[in-house]
């Protein structure tokens, strides 16, 4: 390898490869069937482009902080399949797990999910990469195992790991 090729490799290829690895581009989804829940969460309901989820999450964070409610793990419930639902009609619940005794005021709502059997998909990747990897794996797993892909799914974000639950 010539010197210029080595410099190019070290200056461009290695950093780009490292960044892709850091973001989780090469991460695999892990899938299992488990019992999960129960959960209690405070959330807001939003409609539109899922790319706005970070902005909507900030609104929920502000509302919880204003009411001095301790936020737990961030959660999202996708209510509509983006493959079959027009962008303006896509609905999502965005929020945080909360304590059993937390009192939530409007505009937020309280959701409760009982303990149930789910297909659980875990992906350790950046928030930009993880959902695509998780849902692709979940849809493939469902098709391969004759399981109907159904919504809503429930997502939890813990320590850089996205966990997507689909009830069975």
Residue map of PLM features:
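A solvent-exposed interaction/effector surface
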Residues: 2-168
């Amino acid at each position: 390898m010539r010197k210029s090729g080595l410099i190019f490799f070290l200056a461009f290829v290695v950093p780009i490869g490292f960044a892709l690895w850091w973001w989780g581009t090469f991460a695999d989804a892990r899938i299992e069937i488990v019992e999960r829940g129960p959960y209690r969460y405070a959330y807001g309901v939003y409609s539109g482009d899922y790319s706005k989820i970070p902005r909507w999450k900030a609104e929920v964070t502000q509302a919880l902080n204003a009411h001095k409610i301790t936020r737990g793990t961030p959660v999202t419930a996708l209510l509509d399949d983006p493959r079959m639902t027009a962008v303006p009609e896509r609905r999502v619940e965005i929020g945080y797990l909360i304590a059993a005794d937390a009192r939530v005021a409007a505009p937020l709502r309280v959701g409760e999910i009982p303990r149930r059997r789910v297909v659980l998909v875990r992906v350790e990747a950046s928030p930009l990469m993880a959902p695509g990897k998780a849902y692709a794996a979940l849809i493939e797993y469902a098709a391969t195992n004759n399981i109907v892909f159904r919504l809503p799914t429930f997502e939890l974000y813990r320590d850089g790991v996205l966990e997507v639950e689909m009830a069975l």
